């Protein structure tokens, strides 16, 4: 094997990309250098970042920070509903997010007269979702249909919601 020697030595900040927030805390949290985790994502990633923050607090790690740019799917949908230039008749709601939020999080969709179907990501799941939305629209109905019952409950993942609400405070990013 041939290993190239770097021509320049870089001694500045180190950046690494990790998909698990606990890794940043476990590997770098006690290294003596400032660790800044950029928390990106929706309800599916937010609970793990919240858990890392609480773990850092419990362990007394003071060099671990989070720059959170998390978003919430229900608020994104609300913004789409409230935009007067958009005329969206229905929504296919993401199953992975809905596992956390539950069906209940989408109650504003039928209140706005729009169809909504929660689906998984398999092709047949998506087709069932589109069919469900079309049937609602043809019947003049507006409801939240859970077509992903094998994973999504009405109330969602309450422990995940609790940890998110303990650590993060929703703010408007307009």
List each language-model region with its residue ranges:
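Glycine-rich oxoanion-binding loops at beta->alpha junctions
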Residues: 2-29, 73-74
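A generic structural signal for alpha->beta connector loops
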Residues: 11, 32, 61-63, 87-88, ...
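Conserved beta-strand scaffold positions in the cores of enzyme catalytic domains, especially
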Residues: 14, 66, 116-118
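Buried hydrophobic packing segments
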Residues: 20-24, 48-56, 77-80, 109, ...
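Membrane-interface helix-loop-helix junctions at boundaries between adjacent transmembrane segments
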Residues: 26-38, 52
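Phosphate/pyrophosphate-binding betaalpha-module
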Residues: 38, 42-105
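A conserved active-site cap/scaffold subdomain adjacent to cofactor or substrate pockets
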Residues: 85-154
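Active-site loops and adjacent core secondary-structure elements that bind or stabilize anionic groups
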Residues: 143-174
């Amino acid at each position: 094997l041939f290993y190239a020697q770097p021509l320049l030595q870089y001694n500045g900040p180190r950046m690494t990309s990790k998909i698990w927030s606990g890794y940043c805390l476990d590997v770098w949290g006690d290294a003596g250098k400032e660790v800044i985790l950029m928390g990106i994502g929706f309800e599916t990633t937010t609970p793990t970042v919240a858990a890392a923050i609480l773990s850092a607090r419990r362990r007394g790690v003071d060099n671990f920070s989070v720059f959170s740019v998390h978003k919430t799917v229900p608020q994104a949908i609300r913004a789409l509903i409230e935009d007067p230039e958009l005329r969206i008749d229905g929504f296919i709601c993401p199953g992975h997010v809905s596992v956390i939020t539950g069906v209940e999080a989408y109650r504003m969709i039928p209140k706005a007269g729009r169809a909504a179907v929660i689906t998984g990501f398999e092709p047949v799941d998506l087709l069932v979702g589109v069919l469900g939305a079309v049937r609602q629209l043809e019947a003049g109905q507006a409801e939240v249909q859970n077509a992903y019952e094998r994973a999504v409950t009405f109330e969602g993942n309450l422990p995940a919601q609790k940890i998110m609400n303990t650590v993060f405070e929703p703010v408007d990013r307009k």
